[in-house]
């Protein structure tokens, strides 16, 4: 197995854990604001990455994808009980299990993009990007006001 892939699989769980968000000392308004800012980052990184997926510039794509993974991992932590509001549907807190599955699928699709980048596989990169984008739409259909 390629040494890059081995390192990738060792580092990804560590990186995901290291992106913990400290929201304990924040007001509901601050958490909602951070959540909305984080969603804006996710949208910006995804929009920036889309044209890059066809460029073959894997180092540049990797940089954006790492930022996207960080933002997505952080985003998952920004929905604690009692922070309902903004554009987030109350259904997030009512059906938390499904919401967490959707977010986990989104994060996994970003990790799959990283594997495509490491393999410099343009075809799987585009496929995984489309899966990631589809995961966004699925979650928004169910959970966005």
Model-assigned labels for residue ranges:
Residues 132-144:
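The canonical Cys-X-X-Cys-His
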